[in-house]
Regions:
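Extracytoplasmic metal-acquisition and chelation regions
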Residues: 1-120
Length: 120
């Protein structure tokens, strides 16, 4: 998982360089994470960059995201996001709705490239 987060960090660096060409220096890249563990991992990768604003979608005490329902506030936050970092692997059942609503949003799934164990 740490390798995925590091890869996501490299992706954010690339996005930062690309967005710097398009945006003014006062604008920041907005990164949203799906839940608190992803937020902490992203925070550790991003560090103290003044070019990236990091937000978390769900409350820190939110448990399992399998049954999480997006709120209007969540959709508003995602509408301003450049990047959405999620766990993937089916944890975020709302992910297809987000991808459909915001086709230009870059979605990074931390489980990409990992062979997941089938629990059945």
């Amino acid at each position: 998982m740490l390798l995925c987060i590091a890869a996501a960090g490299l992706g954010l660096t690339t996005l930062s360089v690309r967005h710097q060409q398009v945006k003014t220096e006062e604008d920041k890249i907005t990164v949203v994470t799906s839940f608190y563990p992803m937020y902490v991992a992203a925070m550790n990768v991003i560090g103290d960059s003044d070019q990236i604003e990091l937000e978390n979608l769900s409350e820190p005490q939110t448990g399992c995201l399998h049954d999480y329902q997006l709120t209007p506030e969540d959709m508003k936050l995602l509408s301003t996001a450049d990047v959405f970092i999620v766990n993937g692997g089916g944890i975020e059942s709302f992910l297809s709705d987000v991808a459909e609503a915001y086709p230009d949003l870059t979605i990074i799934q931390a489980t990409d490239g990992i062979d997941l164990v089938d629990d059945n």
